[in-house]
């Protein structure tokens, strides 16, 4: 009996390498699914993330979105920052009078502001960043950087220090940057994105044309928007960091493409 068991064990060890050599990847691959190569070639890999990121800049909805994203705007802006600053009032006694109008901050409204302007935008931006590192498509990443800053600067101005320079680096604990560090990084990131898209515009090419809900892939309009965003951020620093404000305001205004000056330049989701 002992010898029989030994023979069985020997046979098992002989068969094991044969099992390990089976091509399980091929067996478990869906032949009808879009491959990574096809997704990168057609823009599908990051197209949805570009659209999602654009919708987080100013979260408003459509009937197709039902109420989720509309309620997100209400809690993130209307009943939090808008009422706190006096731009918006109420005809409903929210939380029996315990709300931002009476300076009694509701945690779910406050957290909604951070989630809307930072957390949800981060996931989409991270996917585009990883794809750019894999494919080398820096035009897509430039667009994502502009959209990210459009979202994150609201979080910065609402909450103060946020994770920025080390965000997306795969760290278990991401350190927070000071406001000055974030502004400096945002200006530099905008400058890099503007340079990338200006080069693209000069070549006559488009960026994410089929997925760009704002400008339909027009890099010139995106450069104008990015320069205008740079100018806006610079004006935020007018009194606390006048030299930095002046430097980046001049950078935006003196760019060859310039800033938004006409109604046709407006950024809107159509």
Task: Please state what every model-predicted region is.
Residues 1, 22-23, 53, 149, ...:
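Terminal processing/anchoring signals of secreted or surface-associated proteins
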Residues 1-30:
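Bacterial Sec-dependent N-terminal signal peptides
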Residues 2-3, 44, 199, 229:
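Bimodal feature
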Residues 9-12, 59, 109, 203:
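Intrinsic structural disorder/low-complexity segments
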Residues 22-85, 134:
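Membrane-proximal, proline-rich intrinsically disordered regions
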Residues 90-270:
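Structured, solvent-exposed acidic/aromatic patches
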